[in-house]
Amino acid sequence: MGSIDEWRIKIDDVDRKLVDLLNERARYADEIGKIKEQLGLDAYSPRREHEVLENVLGSNKGPLSDAALRRLFERIIDESRKLEREAMIERKKLTSQK
């Protein structure tokens, strides 16, 4: 069964991996934001967000419920969109200063 401390060490390891993966995802979202900006597209893409949620829920094998994963990924998507918009604003500022 293992001790609480052993299980917490495993959770800490998973948390570090999640942070790495979330930051990797954020870098990809930033690159997509650059492309969207070049194409004149908004950071908000409801169709794509729906696809992401469907992909996530389709791969869920538990024990987290679909509702729990939906809430988590809605937040992840929201933060990615915020990052895209902030980066777009920052790039526009840099462009206008030239």
Question: PLM features: residue spans?
Answer:
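Domain-level signature for soluble enzymes in the chorismate/prephenate branch of the shikimate pathway
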Residues: 1-98
